[in-house]
């Protein structure tokens, strides 16, 4: 009955928007989600374990030459009428001189049940059962020399109904689960594991925790050294390289380019000729979605071809403006109260041919993990942290008014780095950072054969989004210290 009520509410809202003369196009989503939040610390029982329900409706409205997004957790028809009125009014307030163009001929009718096998769907298990599995997984690390451990588990079983004024009607299901683990003592190590295969993600948890323990033991037993900031030949392990590449490809988002926050355009040199990057959808991956919030089927994008930018990340508006096609890159936020954003999905870096030992011999510093990136350009940092309407034309208008922010650089804290002496592991680096320019991959010296996948979450304009990147190790020159 609850799902039917959400579908009825979404249908009411799309019909209301179809009756608005000012509305050129609109997309409506009805959300029915059951969530679990579990935290396990040093106690042999969960610190917290709660189940949450979400029932709501959102709309993305094209009117008055602008685009606006609104969300409501009320399914009452009067409240939805007010939601529609406010969305149209906000579009009028944000109106631009350039009318928004959209694809009025695109129509989809489909259903997609996600990537969780029927027996692995998350709503088939209770919160207590999930909490017991979390406690069992960390029990061998509690009260040991491994240091303090914390495990965070988040999941949601979500059904979404997507409707638009073209007549599209799509139903999707997603069973998404993620673990975040921290082990702290003489050193602190972190990891994240996420997927959309439902309860099957639990099968990968022991391996993640075992790897976390190995990194912790390796770090605390190593001699420690400090480094003065200097340009060095650096070996980035696959997950460190993935973190770097994921941060750099955000400069290829069409709204970032429109705002003047990117030094790149399509056709520019992004990296060395060794570098090829695709943006993909991997079935069961943490960022896997069958459709984006514009009801576009998610399809692969050739992002960087032998070092040259082959495409940008687009929504339907920016794609039509540039006479190209959108590929389903408008991702919903983890919290639907915040607008969807143009964003990378699964960033896939093609492997190289260099064996691990040769990579190590080429570098003087090796880095296993990088922390969250920080943009040193104050203008870029402030704009990406602020709320911005999900409208590329509004972004372009912001770019015209924004002062020149100066040089773009990104800084990453090192979470697991050490010196290399003739390819062998030396002292551990503590308290150091890596700082790079957006063009750092032009100096890419070597790519490894073996790839690994990093998952996590990132914020863009206050919207929290999942990320996923698969990369080989790489050697490049950058500032470390």
Question: What would you call each of these model-derived segments?
Answer:
Residues 1-481:
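N-terminal small-residue-enriched
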């Amino acid at each position: 009955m609850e799902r039917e009520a959400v579908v009825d509410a979404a249908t009411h809202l799309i019909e209301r928007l179809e009756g608005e003369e000012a509305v050129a196009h609109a997309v409506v989503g009805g959300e029915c989600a059951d969530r679990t939040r579990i935290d396990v610390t040093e106690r042999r029982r969960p610190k917290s374990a709660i189940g949450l329900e979400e029932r709501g409706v959102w709309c993305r409205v094209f009117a008055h030459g602008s685009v606006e997004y609104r969300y409501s957790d009320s399914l009452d028809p009067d409240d939805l009428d007010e939601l529609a009125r406010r969305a149209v009014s906000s579009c009028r307030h944000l109106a631009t001189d350039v009318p928004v163009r959209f694809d009025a001929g695109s129509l989809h009718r489909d259903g997609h049940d996600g990537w969780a096998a029927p027996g692995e769907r998350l709503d088939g298990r209770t919160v207590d059962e999930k909490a017991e599995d979390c406690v069992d997984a960390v029990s061998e690390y509690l009260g040991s020399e491994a240091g303090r451990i914390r495990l965070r588990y988040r999941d949601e079983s979500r059904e979404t109904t997507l409707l638009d004024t073209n007549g599209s009607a799509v139903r999707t299901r997603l069973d998404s689960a993620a673990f975040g683990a921290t082990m702290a003592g003489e050193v602190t190590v972190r990891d994240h594991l996420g997927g959309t295969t439902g309860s099957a993600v639990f099968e990968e948890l022991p391996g993640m925790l075992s790897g976390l323990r190995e990194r912790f033991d390796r770090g605390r037993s190593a001699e420690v050294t400090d480094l003065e900031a200097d340009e060095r030949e650096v070996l980035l392990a696959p997950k460190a390289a993935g973190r770097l590449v994921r941060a750099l490809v955000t400069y290829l988002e069409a709204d970032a380019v429109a705002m003047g926050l990117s030094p790149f355009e399509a056709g520019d040199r992004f990296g060395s000729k060794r570098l090829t990057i695709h943006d993909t959808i991997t079935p069961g991956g943490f960022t896997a979605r069958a459709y984006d919030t514009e009801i576009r089927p998610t399809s692969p994008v050739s992002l960087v071809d032998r070092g040259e930018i082959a495409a940008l990340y687009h929504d339907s508006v920016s794609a039509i403006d540039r006479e190209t096609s959108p590929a389903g890159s408008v991702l919903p936020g983890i919290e639907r109260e915040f607008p969807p954003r143009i964003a990378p999905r699964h960033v896939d870096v093609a492997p190289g041919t260099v064996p691990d030992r040769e990579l190590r011999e080429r570098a003087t510093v090796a880095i296993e993990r990088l922390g969250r990136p920080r943009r040193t350009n104050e203008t870029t940092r402030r704009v990406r942290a602020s709320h911005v309407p999900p409208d590329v034309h509004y972004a372009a208008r912001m770019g015209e008014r924004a002062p020149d922010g100066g040089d773009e650089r990104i800084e990453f804290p090192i979470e697991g780095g050490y010196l290399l002496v003739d390819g062998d592991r030396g002292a551990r680096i503590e308290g150091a950072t890596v700082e790079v320019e957006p063009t750092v991959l032009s100096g890419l010296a070597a790519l490894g054969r073996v790839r690994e996948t990093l998952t996590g979450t990132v914020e863009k304009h206050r919207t929290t989004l999942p990320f996923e990147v698969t990369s080989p190790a790489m050697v490049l020159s950058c500032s470390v210290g």
